[in-house]
A protein has these predicted regions:
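Short, small-residue-biased leader/transition segments that mark boundaries at the very start
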Residues: 1-7
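Basic polycationic patches enriched in arginine
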Residues: 8-14
């Protein structure tokens, strides 16, 4: 009975979303990790997205964003300090036709390639898990903006270990149809 109550309590807490001031939320946290914001402009005319990264290690802090065609990719700020590029050099933003993909890792390419071959956002992410950066097992966060009749919808996903246990990958996807003017959603790795 005790564990059942614990599960219900955790589910209840997870299902509650509250409005926040993103600036205040990030300012009050020493290390928010990586995050994605997707929403709709206040005038209702545009989709809006933002992505941020922070790093703990010298290798992770040694990166900058650069434009790459219709998207963005990371690159080493100082190539002589680059140690292991596999988790820090990637395209966080790619455009596939009229869809915009935003992620915190190389799963951007996975989503792009699978969707190019007719699979969905969720099907693409079923082929991936959290990052292999033991002991952190950093969650993979992803988002996609897709047009619909006269507007757009978006989805966000997080793939994470089971409270630090790499034996299990927990997959959460949140879909937002016809978003409200001036509102958005924020998904992050460590907050």
């Amino acid at each position: 009975v005790g564990s059942e109550m614990c599960i219900r309590d955790r589910l209840k807490r997870r299902s509650i979303m509250k409005k926040i001031d993103i600036y205040e939320e990030l300012k009050s946290n020493d290390y928010p990790g990586r995050g994605i914001v997707i929403g709709k402009s206040a005038d209702g005319k545009s989709a809006v997205t933002a992505y941020f990264i922070m790093g703990r290690s010298v290798n992770s802090r040694n990166r900058v964003f650069i434009e790459d065609g219709d998207g963005i990719r990371t690159q080493a700020f100082d190539p002589s300090k680059l140690e292991d590029p596999h988790l820090i050099i990637y395209a966080p933003v790619r455009v596939l036709g009229d869809k915009t993909i935003v992620t915190n890792g190389d799963q951007t390419d996975t989503i792009y390639e699978h969707m190019e071959n007719g699979q969905t956002f969720e099907q693409s992410l079923r082929t991936r898990e959290f990052e292999d950066d033991d002991p952190n097992f950093t969650p993979r966060i992803s988002g996609i903006i897709e047009p619909n009749k006269g507007g757009f919808d978006y989805s966000m996903s997080i793939l994470k270990s089971a409270d630090g246990n790499p034996q299990s990958c927990q997959r959460y996807t949140f879909s937002y149809n016809n978003p409200l003017d001036g509102e958005g959603h924020f998904i992050h790795t460590y907050m």
